[in-house]
């Protein structure tokens, strides 16, 4: 996501992934949200709104962001599997909830098409990078 938004960030996280990825994924979302908020500073001179439709093969996802100072996550994403490799698909929503709370921002994800869970989630993250590059 940060590379797509025009910058490159490096984050190292050590979590209890031998149990599951839930808390680690949520904590990464929180940490990136806090870093993004610090990078925005007082938000002077930025556009408040950004959105992007991203096609990833058969998947089509809209990500819309409002840097409102209020936390809302609308997750209208419907994946066909519970896992991508070892990753629990529900953790993607937890990542974005942690991110939205930490900025704070309103973030919407809407799925228009898609069956392959990998493509759907990849479109969410890349679409968010493009939407966040617009404000």
Report the location of each language-model feature.
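Structural preference for solvent-exposed beta-strand-turn elements
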Residues: 1-135
